[in-house]
């Protein structure tokens, strides 16, 4: 199979490229990435000379480039996105352009070039927030209620993808995932920032009271779920992908990281809260489990310790990103 992977130099995208080439060495992958601050070709050093892999630096908003690449492939796997909520609050424009216009350009390319199979990666943040302490979880039938420019842009892209299926018969699938963690994550997100700050001897910042709850998904479990959706998912369907950490708060996660790194709670610094900060996310991943047989393989503590060790062993990788 020939794949176009967008955003394949980013955190989740690069993990997927590595996963896919290892599992299916006969596949060929074109990786289209603009190489913004979050894209890093060092993530893909191990495959850069693989004859089945090709990197193209470019923008998904460029229709001529997108058309030329989609003509060569059977499947588009669309990761490319601006994803950092704080950055979307400071400047929403790049999120609107990349996440909405870029998705439109890719959909048009897939439609014009033989209705190519299209998988769209999205987020659980499109559903808004759940009440802290409740047992409610997001499911595929949860109404959309985005609260940040980032999540609103992803919600818009999800609706566009579905519209291209309903209007033009484009063979699409969508996955909405929980927050990811693991190797190659840019050190501005909770796990990477906390771990690298400790390694630098700095305080670990925690927003507000630290009681915000997220569902955390190890990136390799996410890659396996996407692979199953590509192989066996029903066209036109959406699948939610969650982890094994439901109802663990941010402050509990930071305390675990500190414990595993032999530090104390004196290394925590509570900082001003983020505007519009959603209190709780939790995912019901029953559908993908029942239909495709997927469930997370990595326990949270096991994967967290592996992530800490990865950052310890790859100091040259993250230090360059923090300077």
Question: In which residue ranges do the predicted regions lie?
Answer:
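Generic structural signal for short, solvent-exposed loop/turn connectors between secondary structure elements
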Residues: 1, 71-74, 114-115, 182, ...
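N-terminal Rossmann-like NAD(P)+-binding domain of SDR-like oxidoreductases, especially those catalyzing
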Residues: 1-180, 220, 306, 311-314, ...
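Short, solvent-exposed loop/helix junctions and linker helices
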Residues: 6, 89, 97-100, 150, ...
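C-terminal substrate-binding subdomain of Rossmann-fold SDR/epimerase-dehydratase oxidoreductases
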Residues: 16, 58, 198-323
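Alpha-helix N-cap/loop-to-helix initiation residues
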Residues: 37, 62, 187, 246-247, ...
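Generic alpha-helical secondary structure signal
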Residues: 39, 75, 125, 159, ...
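NAD(P)-dependent short-chain dehydrogenase/reductase
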Residues: 43, 130-137, 147, 159-231, ...
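Residues in well-ordered alpha-helical elements
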Residues: 64-67, 86, 93, 104, ...
């Amino acid at each position: 199979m020939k794949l176009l992977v967008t955003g394949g130099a980013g955190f989740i995208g690069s993990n997927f490229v590595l996963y896919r080439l290892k599992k299916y060495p006969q596949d060929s992958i074109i990786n289209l990435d603009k190489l913004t601050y979050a894209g890093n070709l060092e993530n893909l050093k191990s495959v850069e000379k693989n004859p089945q892999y090709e990197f193209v630096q470019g923008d998904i908003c460029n229709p001529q480039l997108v058309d030329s690449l989609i003509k060569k492939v059977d499947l588009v796997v669309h990761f490319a996105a601006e994803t950092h909520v704080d950055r979307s609050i400071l400047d929403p424009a790049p999120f609107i352009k990349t996440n909405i216009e870029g998705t439109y350009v890719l959909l048009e390319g897939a439609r014009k070039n033989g209705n190519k199979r299209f998988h769209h990666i999205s987020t659980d943040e499109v559903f808004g927030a759940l009440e802290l302490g409740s047992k409610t979880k997001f499911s595929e039938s949860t109404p959309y209620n985005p609260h940040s420019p980032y999540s609103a842009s992803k919600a818009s892209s999800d609706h566009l993808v579905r519209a291209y299926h309903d209007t033009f018969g484009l063979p699409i699938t969508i996955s909405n995932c929980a927050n990811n963690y693991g190797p190659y994550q840019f050190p501005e997100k909770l796990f990477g920032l906390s771990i690298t700050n400790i390694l630098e001897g700095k305080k670990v910042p925690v927003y507000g009271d630290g009681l915000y709850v997220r569902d955390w998904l190890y990136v390799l479990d996410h890659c396996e779920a996407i692979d199953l959706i590509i192989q066996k998912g029903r066209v036109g369907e959406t699948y939610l992908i969650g982890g094994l950490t439901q109802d663990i708060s941010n402050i509990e996660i930071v305390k675990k990281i500190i414990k595993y790194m032999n530090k104390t709670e004196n290394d925590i610094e509570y900082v001003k809260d983020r505007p519009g900060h959603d209190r709780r996310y939790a995912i019901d991943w029953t559908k993908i489990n029942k239909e495709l047989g997927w469930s997370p393989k990595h326990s949270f503590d096991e994967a967290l310790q592996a992530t800490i060790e990865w950052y310890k062993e790859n100091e040259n990788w993250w230090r360059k990103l923090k300077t």
